[in-house]
């Protein structure tokens, strides 16, 4: 990297002239800052600031945690129609169908990262809702949407901070994309300025936080009562008997009033339920927080991987009790049948997008332990 305020390196200028996105990287040695403390200083309350953390097995910190902010593009989809904002908060409808629009944005955002950077150092970050499946499968009319949220939102951050718990360093990556219309000098200077601003924010003292208090949990409510849920079960069994379906998830939303700080909610969640996939996503007018033990899918170097989890027991209070619960879980016919069904569904899903004869089960019916539960995984 050239000194701040200097011209861009030759590789940056050459790649930019060829129309390829570029990154500017800065490494900070830091073994005191945590991803949570950093987010409180650089992302708290910022629209489209994201935090992704990992606690492997519910006990050991994963190697990487990520903060993203300052997207130059935000893509969203609702009811099959896509819109794009170029960082100014104003969304314009895309001329093509949603999948064509998304493919175009992905192609414009693809870049070659320098050696030594993890793959999540730049690109698109966001969420897909379940209703995005309607772009691929004919499912009939959509259900009512009481939350009135987009079906998907993807952001293209120009600043990504990667916390490496092995090297005890923070890697700052500022991405620049030629579709923004800047020349190489201006794009490089803007990337340097973003790194400077982030580093300044990071070096500030932590903001004062409200004193922690013990508060009663809010009451959760569901739009479905017990009788209504029983009716749903009966209808599902009828569909199965008729051959229309062979598995259904009877999900329904539990809601509670929350007037506190959304990030405080996330901090409580990560303490109570540490997991390999923790996230806090601030979209401005709504936030998402979650803690999950499993990936939905991963695509890396042309290989698709899924890891279905199904079958659960609570953790035992002693090692002996824990092993007994594991044996009980693996011997339970219902749990094994459910897991086998998910395994078959997973093979089918992967097979739809893979070369014939290349799908294989690498490992099956292994028990993974987390802070409060254990799961069967394949």
Residue ranges and their predicted role:
Residues 1-378:
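Extended alpha-helical targeting/anchoring segments
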């Amino acid at each position: 990297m050239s000194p701040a305020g200097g011209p861009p390196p030759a590789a940056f200028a050459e790649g930019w002239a060829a129309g390829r996105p570029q990154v500017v990287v800065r490494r900070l040695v830091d073994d005191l800052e945590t991803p949570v403390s950093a987010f409180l200083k650089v992302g708290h309350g910022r629209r489209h600031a994201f935090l992704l953390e990992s606690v492997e097995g519910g006990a050991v910190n994963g190697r990487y945690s990520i903060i993203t902010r300052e997207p130059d593009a935000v893509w969203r989809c609702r009811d099959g129609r896509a819109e794009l904002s170029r960082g100014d908060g104003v969304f314009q409808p895309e001329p093509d169908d949603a999948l064509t629009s998304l493919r175009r944005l992905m192609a414009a955002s693809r870049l070659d990262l320098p050696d030594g950077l993890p793959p999540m150092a730049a690109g698109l970050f966001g969420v897909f809702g379940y209703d995005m499946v309607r772009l691929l499968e004919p499912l009939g009319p959509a259900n009512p949407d009481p939350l009135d949220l987009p079906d998907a939102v993807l952001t293209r951050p120009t600043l990504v901070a990667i916390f490496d718990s092995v090297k005890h360093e923070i890697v700052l990556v500022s991405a620049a994309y030629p579709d923004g219309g800047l020349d190489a000098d201006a794009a490089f200077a803007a990337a340097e300025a973003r790194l400077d601003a982030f580093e300044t924010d990071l070096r500030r003292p932590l903001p004062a936080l409200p004193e922690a208090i013990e508060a009663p949990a809010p009451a959760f409510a569901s739009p479905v009562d017990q009788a209504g849920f029983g009716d749903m079960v009966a209808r599902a069994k009828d569909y199965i008997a008729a051959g229309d379906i062979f598995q259904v998830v009877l999900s329904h939303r539990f809601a509670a009033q929350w007037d506190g700080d959304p990030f405080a909610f996330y901090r409580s969640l990560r303490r109570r339920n540490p997991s390999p996939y923790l996230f806090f996503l601030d979209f401005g007018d709504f936030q998402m927080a979650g803690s999950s033990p499993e990936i939905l899918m991963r695509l890396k170097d042309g290989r698709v991987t899924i890891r279905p989890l199904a079958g659960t027991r609570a953790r035992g209070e002693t090692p002996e009790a824990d092993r007994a619960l594991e044996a009980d879980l693996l011997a339970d016919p219902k749990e094994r049948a459910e897991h086998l069904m998910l395994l078959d569904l997973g093979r089918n899903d992967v097979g739809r997008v893979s070369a014939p004869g290349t799908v294989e089960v690498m490992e099956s019916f292994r028990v993974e332990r987390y802070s409060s539960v254990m799961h069967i995984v394949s």
